Amino acid sequence: MELNARFVERTVSLFGEKRYARFIEALEKEPVVSVRYNVHKMLADDSLERVPWAEYGRYLPQRPVFTADPKFHAGCYYVQEASSMFIEQVVRQYVSSPVRALDLCAAPGGKTTHLLSILPAGSLLVSNEPMPLRAQVLAENAIKWGNPASVVTKNVPADFASLRNFFDLIVVDAPCSGEGMFRKDSFAVEQWSVGNVEQCVKRQREILSSVWDALRPGGVLVYSTCTFNREENEDCVAWIAEELGAEPLSLNIEVEWGVTSALVGSIPAYRFIPGYTSGEGFFLAVLRKGGDSAVAQPRAPRAQQPVAKVRNEICSWLQLSGEYDFVQEGDRVIALPKEHYAAMLVLLQKMRVLHCGLPIADIKNNKLIPVHALAMSRALNRSAFPIVELEREQALAYLHRETLSLPDAPKGVVLLAFDGAVLGLAKNVGNRANNLYPAEWRIRKDPMEL
């Protein structure tokens, strides 16, 4: 790997020669592969090496073809870089009661799915990505994870300024120069320049300034990057503390994890450097906004309600249906957790929402057609529909959105599963089963290549 001479000069100066030499040695090795399990759908494999700072994170001995695993598509686990799982320590040490949280730069969904697993019960997570295609991927991953207390938006950061004091916790995994991903991303190596670093610093501060009013006084900000330089890391944290008015917070960590403390100044911050930690480059700091007040409690806007007949039928499709209120957006019926009903309606009204709560069904020709998000949800009442177990080849055919034959299955809507994990829905009409898997999510790779 040939690195830019200015990058080498700057990083040696920051790391010191001994740490830099160990870092360069690690860059010549293959990246580690890690996953994080969704324990609402699948037990973590305890035969695998654990990611020490994440309860359900595991290292894999080699990289399999994830696309060929039906459980990957069912949301049973997420392929995530191990270092970035460190956000779990922030939640465990500073979030002890339900919160309203924002993952501002959330695509493709690693931190979002992690937060959906570890935030205290009763929390609401808003995940945002302004780029349309990346936002679609984010929504797909959030839906597959199956937590109904989730909203996905596609807004620019400045749009959140209108939601004053709306969030207890904001995570900004900021766009950065990507130095920490050099081992995995040759494009990041080629594109690196001091000028790009300077542009990233400017953009990061704009993002933080624009979203600051949305964090309540006393709320917690998590700032992270996947880069090494001080300008985007320690210097930016110092700027947040001084210019925006925030108190940096320390985390309790184990020495054996190999996490490196801040390399500049005395502000608490945490660096993951290949050669010292098993993962890619990562930086994280935690700050508390000055002051103290509760999050804003919005008044619920008016919303269209589904008729009683519709509501009664869909209630049978849910576990604990009494915990939800229902709204109708066009022909789509959505369940919203009662505790977040007002907040979710405000978001639907003010923001560019791609996904909200639990979409349950579409109304077509006066009939209710269950939608894929219901099949993915942990709130699904699995006894509401017949379940058909598929062999691996059948499961992959379904995920390619091919027409299936289910001669032994009852007619009507059925749940399709692989090894107990629900993959989605199909409508069995006897001689064939109409595939209801979302067309935009289908596997595009040729089956012979899997």
What are these regions (language model features)?
Residues 31-89:
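Conserved AdoMet
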Residues 97-107:
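Conserved class I S-adenosyl-L-methionine
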Residues 108-121:
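Conserved SAM-binding loop of SAM-dependent methyltransferases across substrates and taxa
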Residues 128-165:
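S-adenosyl-L-methionine
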Residues 167, 220-223, 228-334:
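Class I S-adenosyl-L-methionine
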